């Protein structure tokens, strides 16, 4: 079990969540490829039911819990509990993480996650960055979808106001640290005065690595925050690597229920409501988003 080995070995809970993911994938594949060479028959309903059976019979009774801000003594902001899943060295006491990898510099097992991210690297091959469409997928705190065509979002800082806490945890924004001594600050550039005066007046601006070179350059303006240890100064890192979480099982269950036409308040209470509560987002019944790029798919 997860509790026996603190999530450091493959365990029953992780196997359950993996089974749910596989069944959801296969069911979705057969349903949406029905009648093509990729799916000669459609047993999707059977697979979706299997996902829910795994949830009802095994996952929910397993005693796993989401890592919440309210129960985290170190949390001060709404996004802190979610962030802690990805920027901590030790996840032994966080039951939401059912399977993870531990690093120890003393034992010669380490990574360079914060070292890379703090320098602007998210891809070791070429310059990169998180997409605007990903950022737009995060809800407002009142549970409504964002209107990406709103002119106010031309201001970088407006993008993060009154938004899902997971967006704040995932994307670098004003006030975030790249590492212990590197604070990000974005504001409108003051173009008045001479070149020297402009340089002096704007020296407090620290962009999300837009001015980097090669793989150290961010090309979208949205830089990954998850995985950054803000106590990092230099050298190698011990940031833990999450491989499976309880939240994944909740999402699988909710999606399978929606595919079966069985998504209701009871399902929401067990799945999406607690996830959104942690993110500081008011739960509202899923509805069609007029700006959703994949029109035709169910909203839940």
Located regions from the model:
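An aromatic- and glycine-enriched ligand-binding surface/loop that stacks and positions planar moieties
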Residues: 9-13, 21-204
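C-terminal substrate/ligand-recognition segments
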Residues: 160-277
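Aromatic-anchored glycine-rich loop motif in surface-exposed flexible loops
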Residues: 1-12, 19-46, 217-242, 253-300
